[in-house]
């Protein structure tokens, strides 16, 4: 297992390099001139050219790429073109609000989704199953931005129960986490149901029932452990999706996180911030997949990696 983990970690190097190259080319193909956006609409050509020189945009593309890669290897992603603050500081300041929003969304989505999936599997083809799957399909079908606007209109504007923007208290997390986690809960419910339906028909489940074990204990002890193997994969992928896919939700709720920072950076063509954020999201996905593989072996000792 240790050798497998080390090999996967070493595999990060070429993967991140390829991502770095693609991101660099992508951001430089975006329409618009960062120097003109930063200088302002009333700036003349001389001022814009001066800004370009200050930002290093007057250098050849290959020179900019070498400067970017050589500094990134040392953990230096440069300065933000807009705020002139270190990119690492900008990301660090926005990371925790996004992380806590992701964790909050993931916790309730996993609890609700797995509970709904187990109930639907145990009472298959009956009204609990139909109700759970109807709610799940609705959760998947409803766009995040539309759900967010609906929740704001009902609970903030009409009822005045919850705040709309900010991240200062636990109340601020309720609406964004519900919006962000709705689709994940729906996916978890459907995936858990499918996995549990397969497990409930296995021989060891019938054997446990024949021995007089209560149905609740059969489901929780024998069914849950074996059904969790494919579900853990989905949990890992969904957690990565939440970390990198909170852009729309953060924009709707004006959340001070990485998603909104990325949107603002794209609008202003802030190349260093865009490159650093996408690299960070890529690293998160790779590490989450590695953790999922390790959890595989922890849940099912029969699984071994070489």
UniProtKB/Swiss-Prot annotation:
Name of the protein this chain belongs to: Glutathione transport system permease protein GsiC
Function description: Part of the ABC transporter complex GsiABCD involved in glutathione import. Probably responsible for the translocation of the substrate across the membrane.
Subunit structure: The complex is composed of two ATP-binding proteins (GsiA), two transmembrane proteins (GsiC and GsiD) and a solute-binding protein (GsiB).
PROSITE patterns from the UniProt entry: ABC_TM1
InterPro entries assigned to the protein according to its UniProt record, in alphabetical order: BPD_transp_1_N (IPR045621), MetI-like (IPR000515), MetI-like_sf (IPR035906)
Pfam families: BPD_transp_1, BPD_transp_1_N
Positions in the Periplasmic compartment: 30-102, 156-168, 250-277
Residue ranges annotated as Cytoplasmic topological domain: 1-8, 124-134, 190-228, 299-306
Statement: the UniProt record of this protein carries the keyword Transmembrane: yes
The family this protein is said to belong to: Belongs to the binding-protein-dependent transport system permease family.
Localization of this protein: Cell inner membrane
Statement: the UniProt record of this protein carries the keyword Cell membrane: yes
Gene3D superfamilies noted in UniProt: MetI-like
Transmembrane segments: 9-29, 103-123, 135-155, 169-189, 229-249, 278-298
Bilayer disposition of the protein: Multi-pass membrane protein
CC per GO annotation: plasma membrane
């Amino acid at each position: 297992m240790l050798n497998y983990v080390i090999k996967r970690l070493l595999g990060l190097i070429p993967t991140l390099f390829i991502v770095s190259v693609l991101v660099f080319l992508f951001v430089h193909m975006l329409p618009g001139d960062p120097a003109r956006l930063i200088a302002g609409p009333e700036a003349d050509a001389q001022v814009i050219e001066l800004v370009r020189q200050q930002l290093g945009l007057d250098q050849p593309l290959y020179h900019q790429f070498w400067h970017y890669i050589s500094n990134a290897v040392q953990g230096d992603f440069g300065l933000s073109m807009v705020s002139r603050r270190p990119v690492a500081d900008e990301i660090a300041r926005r990371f925790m609000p996004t992380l806590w929003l992701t964790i909050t969304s993931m916790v309730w989505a996993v609890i609700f989704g797995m509970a709904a999936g187990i109930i639907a599997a145990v009472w298959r083809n009956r009204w609990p199953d139909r109700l759970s799957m109807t709610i799940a399909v609705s959760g998947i079908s409803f766009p995040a931005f539309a759900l967010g606007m609906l929740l704001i209109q009902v609970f903030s504007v009409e009822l005045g129960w919850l705040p709309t923007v900010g991240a200062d208290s636990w109340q601020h997390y309720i609406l964004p986490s519900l919006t962000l986690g709705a689709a994940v809960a729906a996916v978890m419910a459907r995936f858990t149901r499918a996995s549990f339906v397969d497990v409930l028909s296995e021989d060891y489940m019938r054997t446990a029932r024949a021995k007089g074990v209560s149905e609740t204990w059969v489901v929780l002890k024998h069914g849950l452990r074996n059904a969790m193997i494919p579900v853990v994969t989905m949990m890992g992928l969904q957690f990565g999706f939440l970390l990198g896919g909170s852009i729309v939700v953060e924009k709707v709720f004006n959340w001070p996180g990485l998603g909104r920072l990325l949107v603002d950076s794209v609008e202003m063509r802030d190349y260093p911030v865009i490159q650093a954020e996408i690299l960070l999201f890529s690293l998160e996905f790779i590490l989450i997949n590695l953790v999922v593989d390790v959890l595989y072996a922890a849940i099912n000792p029969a699984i071994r990696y070489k």
